[in-house]
Amino acid sequence: MFRLLLTLTIWAGHSLTCLSASLTIALTGDIMMGTTYPTPRLPRGDGKYLFRDTRDILRQADLAVGNLEGTLCDKGETRKEGKANNYAFRTPTSYAWWLKDAGYDFVSMANNHSFDFGIEGVISTEHALRQQGIAFAGIAGRSETAVVMRQGVRIGLCALGHNSYTVSHLDLKKVGKLLKQLRQQCDIIIVSFHGGAEGTAQSHVPNGMEGFLGERRGALRQLAHYCIDHGADVVYGHGPHVVRGIEVYKGRFIAYSLGNFCTPFGISLQGVSGYAPIVTVTIDHKGRFQKGRIYSFIQSYGAGPRKQDGKRFLVAHQMKALSETDFPHSDAWIDLRGNIGLIRYTRRSLTTI
């Protein structure tokens, strides 16, 4: 029996500079630009200013990726239980343009809000993204992978989640098969995962399985290493709504959670929940990590990610501390300005580059 690998191919708009030498990828966390459900909570200028401070960084990358937390649809009722604080997100389809304008090339749909408005919401979201030329993946049986072309180089992306309608990272055997098939098609592979417990107390990456609200949310260290061992070159996560540490494992880059990036409504932005980094990662033509940088932005209610005076490196400091605590044997170092480098080991010495 042959298994069908569902793949969406997008020919992206901006060029890849010196691909034979390197590729720079901009990674971000959760995106929920506003919602019309149950009552409208939309940003000033109908979304025009959401990405004003981050647009240049995202556009300058060869590839910009993030997690679309919710749906892009203009009507419909949620299947979720009616509660006063109902986390069901319905962003107008017109806001897909702001994703494109911000510089995004790919978004994950493998999260616990993609089905907030049922299959109709999924179809509407897919259509809105296609209209803007933005690739997507993460829904089992519909959009399991995407391939983005850059000057003849095929970059494969897959998005994993823990919900029944996603490509589940709880089934490592299935993940391995997906990566094997993607590796046969592509030169570089990027994996996005949605997992981990949620909340301000969940900044550290534990060993073993994480749970939240009775759900199994993944053994994320094991998952990330498994993906690298089976062909992935870059792995990035989201789901806890706070940032977590990074590591370089076998020469490949892993970010365990990039937190809330552009979530001006409906999600707490207090304290560390408002930390909104962009992490840029430069890899060589074989996918090996070369260098990176953590750009520190802070969110405030209704505004999106912003630079803040006196806090230029605040998020980088947090991610540096978490990385050094949780991944002391990583091959990466982070300085106080957010630069990420690679530790080189020799027989007689240890050097950083």
Predicted regions and their residues:
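Acidic, metal/ion-coordinating pockets
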Residues: 19-353
